[in-house]
Amino acid sequence: MKDTPKHQGLRNQLVTVLQQKGITNKNILEAISKIPRHLFLNSSFEDYAYQDLAFPIGAGQTISQPYTVAFQTELLEVKKGDKVLEIGTGSGYQTAVLCMVGAVVYSVERQNELFKKTSLLLPKLGIRAKHLSFGDGYKGLPNYAPFDSIIVTAGAPEIPKALMAQLKIGGKLVIPVGENSQIMTLIIRKDETQFEKHEFGDFKFVPLLEDKN
C-alpha cells in the first residue's frame, strides 16, 4: 500500500473531526495529519482508515480510534524530549503519534506477533522509537525509569503500582481504568508518596492482561 494525495485529503478531514470533538493541541493534530494510519491496518480496512473508529489488528487487539489516541496524548501534555513509556505498542500508531510530537518513546507489547510486526513497520515509515520491547506491560520498564509520562493503551481493572513507581515527580500517567467500560484516568505524581487523580469520560478498551508471556 502507498500513501497518496487521496489519503492526505482523508487525514485532513479526520483532523477537522477531531477538532470538532474538542482536540486543540496543534502538534497532535499535525501528527495525525501526517501519519499514514492506513498502513497500520490490514489492507481490507484501508477505505475506513481515516474514520474515527477502532479496528481489529490481530492477536485479539485493536487500533484505538484516533480521537482516543489524540485525547490520551493531549492529557500527557508531551514536551519535546520528554521520556514517555507506552504500555501496549499494538499497531504502533499511538507510538508514531508520540514520536511525531517529540517524545522519546519506550514501548512494551505483550503479543509477540504484534511486537514483531510493529518493530518492522515503524522504521520503514521513518518512525524511530527509542526502545521497543516484548513483555508484561504491568511491570513497566524499571530499568529505564523514571519517565516524564506513561500512557496505557489497554483497559486495566486498577492502576498498576509498578507504573506509578516509575513516574518522575511531576510526571503523568494516563490509563483507562475499569472492568467493562473504562474511565480515562490521569494520575499526576506530586512527590515520593503523593499522587493526584483526575477522571475523564467513559472509553472502551481491550483488557490489559497480566503475566501472559
From Swiss-Prot:
Single annotated GO MF: protein-L-isoaspartate (D-aspartate) O-methyltransferase activity
Gene Ontology cellular-component annotations: cytoplasm
Localization terms from the record: Cytoplasm
This enzyme's EC code(s): 2.1.1.77
Gene Ontology terms describing biological process: methylation; protein modification process; protein repair
The protein's name in its UniProt record: Protein-L-isoaspartate O-methyltransferase
Keyword Transferase found: yes
Cross-referenced PANTHER family: PROTEIN-L-ISOASPARTATE O-METHYLTRANSFERASE (PTHR11579), PROTEIN-L-ISOASPARTATE(D-ASPARTATE) O-METHYLTRANSFERASE (PTHR11579:SF0)
Reactions performed catalytically: [protein]-L-isoaspartate + S-adenosyl-L-methionine = [protein]-L-isoaspartate alpha-methyl ester + S-adenosyl-L-homocysteine
Primary role: Catalyzes the methyl esterification of L-isoaspartyl residues in peptides and proteins that result from spontaneous decomposition of normal L-aspartyl and L-asparaginyl residues. It plays a role in the repair and/or degradation of damaged proteins.
Active site, per annotation: 64
Source species, domain of life: Bacteria
PROSITE patterns, sorted: PCMT
Cited Gene3D superfamilies: Vaccinia Virus protein VP39
Sorted UniProt keywords: Cytoplasm, Methyltransferase, S-adenosyl-L-methionine, Transferase
UniProt KW Signal keyword: no
Family statement: Belongs to the methyltransferase superfamily. L-isoaspartyl/D-aspartyl protein methyltransferase family.
